[in-house]
From Swiss-Prot:
Protein name: Octanoyltransferase
More about this protein: In the reaction, the free carboxyl group of octanoic acid is attached via an amide linkage to the epsilon-amino group of a specific lysine residue of lipoyl domains of lipoate-dependent enzymes.
Keyword field contains Protein transport: no
Its EC number(s): 2.3.1.181
Length: 250
């Protein structure tokens, strides 16, 4: 699913149904359940054209969220709460120092979920590369943005994606590790991937990269990617099995 392929839309065409500006809501630190409820409400409003497209910008208190393909063996044993959510993928961690964005975007017809995901990844790759990690890219077979290591086991994930489309409108989104701890990843199998690591912008560039410093550049890159001004390219440096290709939990 991560390999670049011809999208339904030309690469330089907007994937959004609307040409109105995207509204941005910076929410600060917000409880995950509260943010999820807000997403669901905004998603329904966007389906009925009661609001314009919007991107929620926030951080979460420390918590695990489990996507539809999470396995029992993925789950933590450290006592932190786990919320089962309706996005794709498996389990991940959210917490302070991690920049989270939830685009609520009505997609143009015909809906191309893969193209949408690739555009979000392209925005992340552009910003990560221009802020000190020039070799960041994709691993074919796995979503998100990665920093290559000398061996496959040393590849490190710096940004994660989890997407849902409801009524033609996107939910959930992306998480960019800025200056958060990676301790809590040790208690899970993050995104179902046991043969690679997790990193942060700060660890890779050697100085403090805050969520605040990354917010404006990432919002601009997302806007460009959705509009077709930032064109999806093949930034793959490796391939690996897709851990999500297992049955969904009930």
């Amino acid at each position: 699913m991560t390999a670049v392929r011809d999208p339904f839309f030309p690469a330089d065409q907007s994937i959004r149904a609307s040409h109105n500006p995207i509204e941005v809501r910076e929410l600060g630190m917000m409880d995950y359940q509260r943010a999820w409820d807000l997403q669901a409400e905004l998603n329904k409003q966007r389906q009925h054209d009661e609001i314009n497209d919007v991107i929620l910008v926030l951080e979460h208190p420390s918590i695990y969220t489990a996507g539809k393909r999470t396995q029992p063996s993925d789950r933590p044993q450290n006592g932190l709460p786990v919320i089962d959510v309706d996005r794709g993928g498996r389990i991940t961690w959210h917490g302070p120092g991690q920049l989270v964005m939830y685009p609520i975007i009505k997609l143009a017809e015909p809906i191309d979920v893969v193209d949408y995901v690739r555009r979000v990844e392209e925005a992340l790759i552009h910003v990560i590369r221009t802020h000190g990690i020039p070799n960041a890219g994709r691993i074919d077979g796995r979503s998100g943005v990665w920093v290559p290591g000398k061996t496959p086991e040393e590849h490190r994930k710096v940004a994660a994606l989890g997407i849902r489309i409801a009524g033609g409108v996107t939910m959930h989104g992306l998480a960019l590790n800025c200056d958060n701890t990676v301790e809590f990843y040790d208690y899970i199998v993050p995104c179902g991937i046991s043969d690679a690591g997790v990193t942060t912008m700060s660890q890779e560039v050697g100085n403090d990269v805050t969520t605040q410093s990354m917010t404006a550049p990432l919002l601009a890159a997302l806007d460009d990617a959705f509009a077709g001004r930032l064109v999806v390219a093949d930034h793959s440096f490796a391939s690996a099995p897709d851990p999500t290709k297992i049955p969904r939990r009930p």
